[in-house]
UniProtKB/Swiss-Prot annotation:
Gene3D superfamilies in UniProt: 3.30.56.10, Bira Bifunctional Protein, Domain 2, Ferrodoxin-fold anticodon-binding domain, Nucleic acid-binding proteins, Phenylalanyl-trna Synthetase, Chain B, domain 3
Lineage: Bacteria, Bacillati, Bacillota, Bacilli, Lactobacillales
Domain tRNA-binding: 39-153
Protein name (Swiss-Prot/TrEMBL): Phenylalanine--tRNA ligase beta subunit
FDX-ACB domain ranges (all copies): 708-801
Gene name, Swiss-Prot/TrEMBL: pheT
Length: 801
């Protein structure tokens, strides 16, 4: 919200520096982004009168003689198409500073001396988006009463100061000058001075020519007025200046008035050309599938059943609360105008504007809420201004449908509760003073009082809101401070917090870098890297489809980061994230999803780069597995890895499911080449673990066990196996022998070739045995090996070589 300080001072009698006001507003609840003046950095720009203007042959240039209030005229060469004799213009004299700190100097153009520059608004730093279209390609023409030689700033209100407010959703009342004026008046204990709009009506009743009806509960109220004999023309300079300072482009005297009322009351309005209507009945209803509407921006919009539309003769003429239709817009030929003021459902407006990516000042205000008590007042004010500025006559009465509750909202409290919550010792007189300054009604006494809250402050509905208002206006800086009471208890980390720290320690120790990715993603990426996707949890009104669904995995987000870095030649990456994924087993519209703590990482590129001593070491499956092994060793968990091809986003031959007993903890594998190509990344290995499941499996601290004094014994065994037998199957067969003294199994060699026969391979293992209470004998170890050999022959048909 941009606030003109000049305009604000017309509404509230204050005389403090704008920066001081900004600081005061920030400390009382409305954040101020900054204060700027359009004239900042500009100098030596004066009013000039064009005395003569001659064309330069074979060019678009003009030689102008300009009166700038000096004894002698100045010759200035100008290329603007709208320069002509007899107009007042903005002249930057030699030495002047214009936008971007550009300094104007004397010069020659096509051999013609130019002693300055005739300026456009853009050359003074005014955004092209707010410059009136009639001056968009040329210079700004000043009012006829502008005095040559005087600075131009006051004529265009460039000497104003613009306060930019950052309005939070709960203070949408400050999206209007009236709302800001009430706030400033309360801060400085001043009265508001709102303009009185005088409206004169004709004897001809508007209801005789127009009817209004509402066919949906999404539009509580709709009102319209009819104006005749309208003369469309540019708005007066003061109104154009005000709108440009507020960031709005002036259009014409009718449209500019609706924008003025929007800023003044916070009430969105729209003007229709009555002569373009095909009927006399305005209906507010929900759109039908298949209906279309060309909006004011020239775009044809496909309407949905959730959209609110204004119709005439059952044809949409406007998207309610968002944008009008092109067919009924105000043009230079318009002479009969219908003014609209209404209240629309904010959620419906937000859904429509979000779906169409069509946001406007009006839709923003409907989404956040408007003052329902001033709808008719704003409509009357707009009619009054158009009658004054466009010579219009206003038909008698407002044509409306629906009802509005404009009565004050009553909220009760006690002085004891106020002081208890705020930690103060306020008197009832202090509370009375606060609500008097706010313009609220108050009845009762210290034991029990009731505050009557005007509809302009629709954010105040409960007792806690009263406490906040008292604290704001009384002054946060005046509230007493105290040290925390010494009655707390020492806290400790939860199990999941400890687990997250352990995981982070292992990941950082392995050289991984932590990142944080979005929990919202696309519907397609949400279910990637999941064997059994759950129901999608979708946002009702996403800002973009890229952030519309809660993720069910973290890998896709990490791969987006990998792709971003790879595209920028950062190819050796080891990234991890600890966060939450969301599993929805019920109806997303009725139930919240389960939040699952997870850990995921992605590795790509080289583990170690090539140097003069060693070859480059690329990332592979086993390097990724080693990180997980280190983690599980730290946690004291014995997990198993089982090959799988059920996760379609992963390589079917290089993927394993990680299990603890019968419970699946996660997966490890290479990103499927097709998926990697879609992300535009090289060979990448990923893993994801369910930390919530691991948390439930963690055991209490293992008691100290004395290191045995007795030596371990190792035996090597080479096995001839069929090629399809896996390492895990061999390990399972060895463990199935039930040898209690077996403490370690290591695979140290794998060989296949013609000598072994077709479809055969050799795998060599080192087996370690140890008795913590005694030395093992050769006979005992031999018996263990016999049991293991028998199990291998039975389970995997192994032949000991």
């Amino acid at each position: 919200m941009l606030v003109s300080y000049k305009w604000l001072k017309e509404l509230v009698d204050i005389d403090v520096p704008s920066q001081e006001l900004a600081e005061k507003m920030s400390t009382t609840g409305i954040e101020v982004e900054g204060v700027e003046s359009p004239a900042a950095g500009l100098s030596k720009i004066v009013v000039g009168e064009v005395l003569s203007c001659e064309d330069v042959p074979e060019t678009h240039l003009h030689v102008c003689q300009i009166n700038v209030g000096e004894e002698e005229e100045r010759q200035i060469v100008c290329g603007a198409p709208n320069v002509r004799a007899g107009i007042k213009v903005m002249v930057a004299l030699p030495g002047a500073r214009i936008a971007d700190n550009y300094k104007i100097k004397k010069g020659k153009i096509r051999g013609l001396e130019s002693l300055g520059m005739i300026c456009s608004l853009g050359e003074l730093g005014i955004s092209d988006s707010v410059v009136p279209k009639e001056f968009a390609d040329g210079i700004q023409i000043l009012p006829e009463d502008a005095v040559p030689g005087e600075e131009v700033f006051s004529y265009l209100d460039l000497d104003d100061e613009i306060i930019e407010l950052s309005i939070t959703p709960n203070r949408a009342d400050a999206l209007s000058m009236c709302g800001v004026a009430h706030e400033v008046a309360a801060i400085y204990d001043k009265a508001v001075n709102f303009k009185k709009f005088t409206l004169t009506e004709t004897n001809e009743a508007a209801a005789d020519a127009l009817s209004v009806s509402i066919e949906t509960d999404k539009a509580p109220y709709y009102a319209a007025r009819i104006l005749d004999n309208v003369t469309i023309a540019p708005s007066p300079q003061w109104l154009q200046n005000l709108l440009m300072n507020e960031g709005i482009r002036p259009i014409n005297n009718v449209v500019d008035v609706t924008n003025y009322i929007l800023l003044y009351f916070g009430q969105p309005m729209h003007a229709f050309d009555l002569d373009t209507f095909e009927g006399t009945d305005i209906r507010v209803r929900e759109a039908r599938d298949g209906e279309k509407l060309v909006t004011l921006d020239g775009e044809e919009r496909d309407l949905a059943e959730t959209d609110l539309v204004i119709t005439v003769a059952d044809k949409p003429v406007a998207l309610a609360g968002v944008m009008g239709g092109q067919a009924t817009e105000i043009s230079e030929k318009s002479s009969r105008v219908i003014l609209e003021a209404a209240v629309f459902n904010g959620k419906s407006i937000r859904k429509t504007s979000g779906r169409l990516n069509l946001r406007s000042e009006s839709s923003s205000r409907f989404e956040k809420g408007i003052n329902v008590a001033t709808v008719n007042e704003a409509l009357d004010a707009a009619a009054s201004m158009i009658a004054e500025l466009a010579g219009a006559t206003v038909r008698k009465g407002i044509v409306s449908a629906g009802e509005l509750d404009t009565s004050d909202v009553e909220v009760s409290s006690t002085l004891a509760d106020v002081n208890r919550v705020l930690g103060t010792e306020l008197s009832y007189a202090d509370v009375e003073d606060v609500f008097r300054r706010l313009g609220f009604g108050l009845s009762g006494n210290a034991d029990s009082f009731t505050v009557s809250v005007p509809r302009r402050r629709w954010d105040i509905t409960i007792e806690a809101d009263l406490f906040e208002e008292i604290a704001r206006i009384y002054g946060y800086d005046r509230l007493p401070t105290s040290l925390p009471k010494d009655d707390g208890t020492a806290g400790e980390l939860t199990v999941i917090q400890k687990l997250r720290r352990q995981v982070r320690t292992i990941a950082e120790g392995a050289g991984l870098t932590e990142i944080i990715t979005y929990a919202l993603t696309t519907p397609e990426k949400a279910v990637e890297f999941t064997a059994q996707p759950s129901n999608l949890t979708e946002l009702m009104w996403p800002m973009t489809v890229d952030r519309s669904v809660l993720r069910q995995n973290m890998i896709s987000g990490i791969l987006d980061t990998v792709a971003y870095n790879v595209a920028r030649k950062n190819k050796n990456l080891a990234l991890y994230e600890i966060g939450k994924v969301f599993e929805q087993t019920g109806n997303p519209k009725e139930e919240l999803p389960n939040e699952i703590n997870s850990f995921a990482f992605a590795l790509t590129g080289l583990v170690a780069e090539k140097d003069f001593q060693t070859a480059a070491v690329p990332v592979d499956f086993f390097y990724a597995k080693g990180i997980l092994e280190a983690l599980f060793t730290r946690l004291g968990l014995q997990v198993t890895y089982t090959a799988t091809s059920e996760i379609v986003s992963l390589h079917p031959g290089r993927t394993a499911v990680i299990s603890l007993g019968d419970q699946v903890l996660g997966f490890l594998g290479q990103v499927h080449p097709v998926t990697a190509k879609a992300y535009d990344i090289p060979e990448t290995y990923v893993a994801e673990l369910n930390l919530s499941a691991i948390e439930g499996a963690l055991q209490p601290a293992v008691p100290f066990v004395e290191i045995t004094k007795f030596p371990a014994v190792s035996r090597d065994v080479a096995l001839l196996l069929k090629a399809e037998v896996t390492h895990q199957e061999v390990v399972d067969a060895i463990q199935a022998a039930g040898v209690k003294r077996l403490t370690d199994i290591k695979l140290f060699d794998v060989f296949s070739g013609e000598k072994l026969g077709l479809g055969m391979k050799s795998m060599a293992y080192s087996l370690t045995f140890q008795n913590p209470e005694d030395s093992l004998t050769d006979e005992e170890v031999a018996r263990y090996m016999e049991k293991i050999q028998a199990s291998l022959e039975e389970k995997v048909n192994a032949e000991v070589r």
